[in-house]
Amino acid sequence: MKEFPKNYNFTENEKKWQQIWQEKQIYAYNPNAAKEETYVIDTPPPTVSGQLHIGHVYSYTQTDFIVRFQRMMGKNIFYPMGFDDNGLPTERLVEKQKQIKAYNMDRSEFIKICEEVVESEEEKFRSLFNQIALSVDWSLEYQTISPLSRKISQMSFLDLVQKEEIYRTNQPILWDPVDGTALAQADIEDKEKTSFMNYITFKTEQGDPLTIATTRPELLPACVAVFYHPDDGRYKHLAGKSAITPLFNEQVPLLTDPLVRQDKGTGLVMCCTFGDQTDITWWKTHNLPLKTIITKKGTIDFQHETSIDGLKIKEARTKIIDILKEQELLIKQEDITHTVKCAERSGAPLEILTVPQWFVKTISHKEELLKRANELNWHPKHMKIRLENWINAISWDWCISRQRYFGVPFPVWYSKRVGEEGKILYADVTQLPIDPLKDLPMGYSKEEVEPDYDVMDTWATSSVSPQLSTHGISDDFAVNKDRHDKLFPMDLRPQAHEIIRTWAFYTILKAHLHQNTLPWKNIMVSGWCLAEDRSKMSKSKGNVLVPEKLLEQYGSDVIRYWSANSKLGADTAYSEDVMKNGKRLVNKLWNAAKFVFIHFDKLKGEDKKASLLDIKEKITNEFDKWMVNKLVELVKLATNELQNYEYANAMHLTEKFFWVVLCDNYLEISKTRSYDEEHKNPQGQYSSILTLYHVMQTLLKLFAPFMPHITEELYQILYSENSIHVKGSWVNYSDLNYEINAKGAEGLLEILDIVRKFKAEKNLSIKTPIKLLEVSGIVLSAELTEDLKNVTSAEEIQFEMKDDKIKVNIIL
């Protein structure tokens, strides 16, 4: 008989098993397995944009719980890992890390530096993901900037061009003056900012004063009209007249529109090109002229005696207000707090500029997308409303152009040939991936074309993350159509709730447009990991937790235990107490396994190899049968919870069974029989050891998705040299049940609880002998009575049926 190791060293064992799993390819995907046997995950490719934090561990391990369960259930798992390593987030990381600015450098040199940085950063992710035991198949790894990903992303673009779902136009777009790029609606956030409502004097062309309230007086040079509500009786006399702008003396029409709020300001609103989306609506609806005064750098471009040319927006606002005051054209100012649209990443207030951009048709598909949201299986269900709210709020088509550098280029040129100047030239699919700055369209020379200098929004590539793994976009555009057809649509998209409006939405949109389908059957939405005081983690607060330190202190299994204690979709605070509970659980598992291990040499070899169903008749003791029935019930419940993506419920059920049913009760109650030092009851001894053997084996499998290292170590010591994590290793006891009256075993537990409380109240050892237990309300069988005697140290037990309520009298 082999020896049980004295101690469990999580540092050594976790490294050992991670290496063995890789070497033995325990998590390898089998491309030859049937489609119906395969379970496919659209793993979130982490953005290569900065420091790793505990939030990465939190969300990725929750996905891994489900993946490991599905593998153990017999599924052929396709579990890739990608890296979202292109676009603005990565550029900002590189600029910060290297103290450089992309616009001050040669484009190719900046891209080269980006490539070097992401390679280094991605290695950190790989190391962390291996340490936390993500059961990914690393041979399926992809990068969103790799040649293959660029090819598939450009295929997506060409497919949507072919389907007339993409267009290019010169229209107002949201512009980030700090990062110098157009943004999509999903890239912005509303921020509360303090400002002034400025009441300014305009005049009619007849010289009558008009008071207009505005927060943006610097846009006066771009004023193209003044509006009032058609039902506003105060201004009906202005119909058909014009207004004269202060300082700039431009004549603009006075018009009516129902979008004007009569209760805001004075009810007179100036329309400028452009201050907000309402300005755009009025500009289009009323066919107004375009006056552009704001540059891409967020400065004023307007030659005038006010000398605001070249000033930044805030500087120009201050100067205009000062001049208005000097000329007594500023009537008053009111302090206000209002919502300002800002760039999500740079934090800069956005401007609206008119720049040629590529757009994906979105608004026209809103109703179809709402139906898609309803077809999808949401886990948890309430997260669906977030997508529905976002779809209903969409008011812009998706702008996918970015005026940046490190991204997927548009496979596009513009002709300079005589007679076709400006004609859009698209790359042939056989040319992909292409860089229009280096490559040429078929049949054209360098002198005959102008490349598209923009790159795609990083979401334009991330939104085809399923297809980056399946290697296809549609029937017409695929690198490997057989692979794509086998893997798409996928089974699961795991992701965080804050990117439902971006990653989930865009991926659903793309799959709908490309193949008229959903990209996956299920979406599993995780919450945020918060600091211990339930505040959001941030570097400025100094409360960001670094995974490496926690791994060093507690090990991977304990951190995964903490993650498993959080309900799916819930925001959860980091908790030292939960970590300590996880550490206790690992230690208790080790000690419980050590206890049962010493008895296993008493079992016959064939009984160790047989299933619990096959040796059912050899478990003869009544309490053992009750224990097995409880185990079968646990397996059914935990399996059902995991099938419904409720990993936290499965973990809670399993842990509670382990601590209460097994450790607190069964081990203590069956201990005397398991040892049977006087050889009084060999059949009862064999029954208890066989029960322990299978209960422990089953619990290790139920814990395995959550704590893979300790369960693997114990499984190999106690049971098999094969991995506990291999395909098909889950337990199925659907046909197993002992026909017994559970009231007997449950009555034993109730009596035991009364005795334990009695001894605890009197500060007596649990082993303190009892002369007589007088029990009323139940009569136990001889087997249960013997077990009760052993566990309570009672010399004699007398039963009497007075009523159904159990009462115990203890005589020491």
Swiss-Prot record:
GO terms for cellular component: cytosol. One of its GO terms (biological process) is valyl-tRNA aminoacylation. A motif ('KMSKS' region) lies at residues 536-540. Disulfide bonds: none annotated. InterPro entries: aa-tRNA-synth_I_CS, aa-tRNA-synth_Ia, Anticodon_Ia_Val, M/V/L/I-tRNA-synth_anticd-bd, Rossmann-like_a/b/a_fold, tRNAsynth_Ia_anticodon-bd, Val/Leu/Ile-tRNA-synth_edit, Valine-tRNA_ligase_type_2. Monomer. Catalyzes the attachment of valine to tRNA(Val). As ValRS can inadvertently accommodate and process structurally similar amino acids such as threonine, to avoid such errors, it has a 'posttransfer' editing activity that hydrolyzes mischarged Thr-tRNA(Val) in a tRNA-dependent manner. This is Valine--tRNA ligase. The lineage of its organism: Bacteria, Pseudomonadati, Pseudomonadota, Alphaproteobacteria, Rickettsiales. The gene is valS.
